[in-house]
From Swiss-Prot:
InterPro entries: Cys/Met-Metab_PyrdxlP-dep_enz (IPR000277), PyrdxlP-dep_Trfase (IPR015424), PyrdxlP-dep_Trfase_major (IPR015421), PyrdxlP-dep_Trfase_small (IPR015422), Trans-sulfuration_enzymes (IPR051750)
Lineage per the UniProt record: Eukaryota, Fungi, Dikarya, Ascomycota, Saccharomycotina
GO cellular component: cytoplasm
Claim: Transcription is one of the keywords in the record: no
GO biological process, one term: sulfur utilization
Pathway annotation: Amino-acid biosynthesis; L-methionine biosynthesis via de novo pathway; L-homocysteine from O-acetyl-L-homoserine
PANTHER family, sorted: CYSTATHIONINE GAMMA-SYNTHASE-RELATED, PTHR42699
Keywords assigned: Amino-acid biosynthesis, Cytoplasm, Methionine biosynthesis, Pyridoxal phosphate, Transferase
Inactivation phenotype: Decreases growth during sulfur-limited conditions. Simultaneous knockout of MET17 results in an inability to utilize hydrogen sulfide for methionine metabolism, and toxic accumulation of hydrogen sulfide.
Protein name, per record: Homocysteine/cysteine synthase
Length: 575
């Protein structure tokens, strides 16, 4: 059953579901406009935006114990992260801030320890920032953008342990403790397997050795060059933090390559990055909230020229250019070779988000950092959050990056139970990628593309978005790689878009890369308050974004054909 009520877990029988039902166009608009009658129906939501039930319960615990008046809170999995949020809120609110940071610890005993090498106990620490009204909006914004949230599995464990400590039996406590220690015991193995899988995916996608000269001398060590974080957004924010670390180190007396003349110079620190192409919304927001951002929203050859003009004429540098390969939701592909050339010429870094392209594209040789959401296709099952940061050892950033990840600036906070689930779900990543590629190609070529210009206004996919995108994509496509599972279809008017969406009998909600087909009116969900502005970059408000799953292709053709028939029956006139 793909009919999921608004605000309910999607699918309905999935524990820790990261998506939720948005079954109709009107419910999507109501959600985007924060209509109380709509928002009030939400039992769960996308975890960075709306705490899932276990996290809601943990918030309630903090509010009851530490709250003042009408406060609410957001919890973090370490004191350091909670403190960073607290300091950010104070920087926004000023000296009048009434937000406060509260910390709760739960100590559990390893009663089953068999050797002295095993820890005798484990301390779980949760740091929550509590605030009311406008300040709480700032807390929520930070929690959403940084992506360093308490996971639902961690929250559930903490809730159960707190309950047991207050009024539980000794036997139940022992069982809970044993469960956590069993997961902690499997944590290192799971994370090592994930890191090894990520490296294998880079060097031998679909089992084929790299043959391109770009890989000459490029080797990855899974223990030194791959880092796991708690979400894809955390991977982006970690990359941004690393750039600031590099800039501060380079311009301080602690520079790794300092000279006497260097120490005499005290240039102003650069906090500007570029975004090349129209990206996932939160990527742009985080760059503007925590620094400065120069936006090249088309991400095409003309923007390459504009970027070069900016670099030649502007008095300020840029730290890096962030790109998506391809972009979400317009599936544009930048010219990575030209961007790499400019980066080398003008001394900036390239950060690539390859969440959408995944195994299909060979992008590491062009990147200094690769940030990926493992929540999406890598995981597939849509029941766990995670992200990764991969370093290019040939980058001039690399020695600073290694120092950053060894310092207190970085904490490995991917919860053990999440790592175990993520490892298990990702074992068939290659096979699922090939199957999703095939389903998407058939669905587009046999059904939707023949309707482009007739029923559909425009289809966005690496093969058809534009000639330039296709050529750029082909230049980095892996030998067995396809074009991905994500496409967007724009309709001529809102009525047609609404008719198609409401009648489409697949799961409908946010996220992508799921094993099941998932659709949403993406531009409204992400940009409803700025439709006119984003339309300048091709983000049509009548776009439906579709992530194609692993269902039987004949079933997919049938349900999409039925939805198209509903649009045809409207008889809209398209000039």
């Amino acid at each position: 059953m793909t009919e999921i009520e608004f605000g309910q877990p999607l699918p309905s029988n999935l524990d820790y579901a990261v998506s939720f039902g948005i079954p109709t166009w009107d419910s999507a608009i109501g959600y985007a406009e924060k209509v109380p009658e709509v928002i009030g129906k939400m039992a769960t939501g996308y975890p960075r935006y709306f705490p899932q039930p276990p996290v809601q319960r943990l918030c309630a615990y903090f509010v009851k114990k530490f709250g003042r008046g009408s406060e609410n809170c957001r919890p973090f999995p370490s004191v350091n992260l909670g403190l960073k949020c607290f300091e950010y809120v104070k920087s926004v609110s000023g000296p009048e801030s009434k937000a406060h940071l509260e910390v709760e610890t739960v100590t559990i005993k390893n009663r089953g320890a068999k050797t002295s090498k095993e820890p005798a106990e484990l301390v779980l620490t949760i740091a929550a920032v509590l605030a009311s009204e406008e300040e709480f909006e700032t807390v929520k914004e930070y929690w959403k953008l940084r992506g360093e949230c308490v996971s639902s599995r961690l929250a559930l464990s903490v809730n159960q342990l707190l309950d047991c400590a207050n009024h539980g039996s000794e036997q139940v406590l022992r069982e809970l403790e044993a469960g956590v220690f069993a997961a902690k015991k499997g944590e290192e193995k799971a994370k090592n397997l994930i890191k090894g899988r990520i490296v294998e995916n880079r060097f031998r996608p679909f089992g084929l050795e790299k043959k391109t000269p770009n890989w000459e001398g490029l080797n990855l060590n899974p223990n030194e060059d791959v880092y796991l974080v708690s979400s894809g957004m955390s991977a982006i924010s970690t990359a941004r933090n690393l750039l600031t670390f590099w800039e501060e180190k380079k311009n301080s007396g602690d520079s790794l390559n300092k000279t006497t003349s260097d120490q005499k110079k005290k240039p102003l620190l650069c906090d500007t990055v570029g975004i090349f192409g129209f990206p996932f919304k939160d990527t742009q927001v985080i760059m503007t909230k925590f620094g400065k951002c120069k936006f090249f929203g088309f991400g095409n050859s003309r923007d390459v020229v504009e970027l070069q003009k900016f670099l030649e004429t502007s008095k300020q540098r840029i730290l890096a250019v962030f790109v998506e390969t391809p972009s979400n939701p317009l599936l544009n592909m930048p010219d990575l070779k030209k961007l790499r050339s400019l980066a080398d010429q003008y001394g900036f870094f390239i950060v690539i988000d390859d969440t959408i392209g995944g195994l299909n594209v060979d992008i590491l040789p062009y990147a200094d950092i690769v940030s990926t959401s493992l929540t999406k296709l890598f995981n597939g099952a849509s029941n766990v959050m995670g992200g990764s940061v991969v370093l290019n050892p040939k980058s001039s950033l690399y020695p600073y990056a290694r120092e950053y990840f060894r310092s207190a600036n970085f904490e490995d906070l991917l919860w053990c139970e999440d790592a175990i689930v993520l490892e298990r779900n990702s074992r068939d990543f290659e096979d699922r990628t090939l199957r999703a590629n095939a389903n998407t190609g058939i669905l587009l070529n046999d059904l939707l593309l023949p309707e482009e210009g007739k029923i559909c206004k425009k289809i966005y996919y690496p093969t058809v978005t534009s000639k330039e995108t296709f050529e750029n994509y082909e230049s980095v496509r892996n030998e067995r790689g396809g074009y991905g599972c994500l496409f967007s279809v724009a309709f001529f008017n809102e009525g047609d878009a609404k008719a198609f969406y409401d009648s489409l009998k697949v799961f409908k909600g946010p996220s992508n890369g799921t094993n099941f087909t998932l659709a949403c009116p993406y531009v409204h969900l992400a940009h409803h308050s700025e439709l006119e502005e984003v339309s300048k970059f091709g983000a049509d408000p009548n776009i439906i974004r579709v992530s194609v799953g692993l269902e039987d292709i004949q079933w997919l053709l049938k349900v999409f054909s039925s939805a198209l028939d509903v649009v045809k029956s409207r008889g809209s006139k398209h000039s």
